[in-house]
Amino acid sequence: NSDTVGWIQIPGTQISYPLMHTSDDSYYLNHTFSKKLNSAGSIFVETLNNGDFSDLHTIIYGHNMKNGSMFAGLKEYSSASYLVAHPNVYIDLADGTHAYQIFSVYEAEADSDSYTIGFAPDETYEEYLKTIKGRSLYDTSVTVTKEDSIITLSTCTKHGEKRFLVLSLIHI
């Protein structure tokens, strides 16, 4: 499928899927990577982001499936001990594997500023990073700066318009 831009994996979890990117965010909400209609959908990158992860902030979406598939496992990060056991997210792209270290975990509204993209490495971005790190359910002891590129893994919760977010910075 030409919409495939990479692979996402969190070792020791069920999260290991192709990453999709298309001009229609709603398409992969209910289509598999093989473009078959399916309520589980796919894991996909925000349409407004570059598919090569060149943005300072890239957002990745996936459903919170009752059977534990897709991004259902993200909710386990509400426990600090789970983060200790699973601290990194790996993204395989055309230019190699990129390791991301988790620095913040929290719930937010679907229309939250947590979904802001299009940053430059300036004071606005630095303030944004400080804000989202401060929202974490617990201290991750990971430092994030305006020179860091980050990803947000986003899934729905049982609380209406709330989303569960796991934010990670690139760790080279």
Predicted regions and their residues:
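Flexible, polar/acidic helix-loop-strand segments at domain edges
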Residues: 123-142
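Glycine-rich, pocket-lining loop/helix-strand segments that form or immediately flank
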Residues: 107-129
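Short, surface-exposed loop motifs enriched in S/T, G, D/E and P with embedded aromatic residues
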Residues: 17-23, 100-102, 168
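N-terminal pre-domains immediately preceding structured catalytic cores
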Residues: 1-45, 50-55
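Mid-length scaffold segments of soluble, non-membrane domains
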Residues: 35, 41-114
